């Protein structure tokens, strides 16, 4: 099986029973299957689950978010079923400050944030790596659908082979040092194959549905989450046309995102879209679809993973949203920013706060945040 071939390379040249692996267990099918399989074939497995928000005591089973209270119990249940060590680490304070509050502040600035990237960058990789080192393990394995390939140029991050499950967009901020230590056993599998393996192993939660929502939103609107941290966030303001004409009013910029068409409550003979959010002046600017079209953008805080130097004019494929197709682009370093010139109009709106991830084929070259 392809999974076995991948697992066999966790630490090349070492017997399975001589390798200690920490598995980041979210309580879902994917990471539970990784932990169960590694344990079954002989690895010394330690499962670690992060308690990220204060619903730990909840045992609801119909939640469709990751890291819910019931997920922690599921992770503990799988560890008990297979007989390996499992720890729960309380990271609520860090998660609140670095993920939830960052999410709220980003929306207040008129951006459209991607909290899952921030979560992976901070508590799920940076802090899990510290825990792994403290436990003196040889590697940290996760249930992400990406691939880690060792080449003559070093370790590289690649897309998972299943396009519908590939999570490389959310992991662009992984560092080279982290990649040396991380393992992604599911990168060569389709989701259906993972679930089949879970059934074959008789994992208790093999039929558990996938998580779909942002974990801390939990059925609420994004605005509800933001208002919890900033009660003053919902201030009424003007909706203007691109020509400066007042078309209506809004009930807070936090309710809008670039490219949004529905919910504007405007009477117009043609469809109008949000083309700009001026959060500082509390103004929403709308226009026709062509006003969204642009062929260049700037990116900040670039994490460059490729071993080759980032030079002006480098050709690559660019992904501007997690569910969007890639578009051919050219990269031009510009001081602290990176200019990205696109060969064609992207099908999605370019929104500040979203991640821009660059690829060469399946390889992740790097990425950053759209400004």
From Swiss-Prot:
EC number: 2.8.1.13
Protein location: Cytoplasm
Site (Interaction with tRNA) location in chain: 144, 354
Sequence segments annotated as region (Interaction with tRNA): 165-167
Pfam family, one: tRNA_Me_trans_C
Job of this protein: Catalyzes the 2-thiolation of uridine at the wobble position (U34) of tRNA, leading to the formation of s(2)U34.
NCBIfam families: PRK00143.1 (NF001138), trmU (TIGR00420)
Protein name in UniProt: tRNA-specific 2-thiouridylase MnmA
């Amino acid at each position: 099986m392809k999974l076995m071939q991948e697992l066999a390379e966790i630490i090349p040249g070492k017997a399975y029973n001589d390798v200690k692996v920490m598995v980041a267990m979210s309580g879902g099918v994917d990471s539970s299957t990784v932990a169960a399989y590694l344990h079954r074939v002989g690895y010394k497995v330690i499962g670690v689950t992060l308690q990220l928000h204060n619903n730990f005591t909840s045992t609801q089973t119909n939640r469709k978010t990751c890291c819910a209270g019931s997920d922690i119990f599921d992770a503990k249940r799988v560890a008990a079923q297979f007989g390996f060590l499992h720890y729960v680490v309380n990271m609520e304070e860090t998660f609140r400050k670095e993920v939830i509050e960052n999410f709220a502040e980003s929306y207040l600035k008129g951006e459209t944030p991607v909290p899952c990237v921030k979560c992976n960058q901070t508590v799920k990789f940076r802090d899990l790596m510290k825990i792994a080192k403290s436990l003196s393990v040889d590697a940290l394995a996760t249930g992400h659908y990406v691939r880690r390939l060792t080449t003559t140029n070093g370790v590289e991050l690649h897309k998972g082979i299943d396009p519908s499950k590939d999570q490389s967009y959310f992991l662009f901020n992984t560092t080279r040092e982290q990649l040396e230590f991380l393992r992604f056993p599911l990168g060569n599998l389709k989701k259906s194959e993972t679930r089949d393996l879970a059934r074959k192993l008789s994992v208790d939660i093999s039929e558990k549905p996938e998580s779909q929502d942002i974990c801390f939103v939990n059925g609420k609107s994004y605005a509800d989450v933001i208002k919890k941290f900033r009660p003053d966030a919902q201030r009424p303001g003007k909706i203007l046309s691109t020509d400066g004409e007042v078309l209506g009013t809004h009930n807070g910029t936090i309710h809008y995102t670039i490219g949004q068409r529905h919910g504007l409550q405007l009477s117009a003979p043609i469809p109008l879209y949000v083309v700009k959010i001026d959060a500082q002046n509390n103004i929403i600017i709308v226009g026709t679809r062509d006003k969204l079209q642009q062929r260049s953008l700037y990116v900040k805080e670039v994490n460059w993973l490729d071993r080759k130097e980032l030079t002006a004019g480098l050709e690559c494929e660019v992904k501007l949203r997690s569910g969007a197709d890639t578009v051919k682009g050219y990269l031009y370093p510009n001081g602290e920013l990176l200019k990205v010139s696109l060969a064609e109009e992207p099908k999605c709106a370019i929104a500040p706060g979203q991640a821009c991830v660059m690829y060469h084929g399946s390889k992740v070259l790097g990425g950053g945040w759209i400004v």
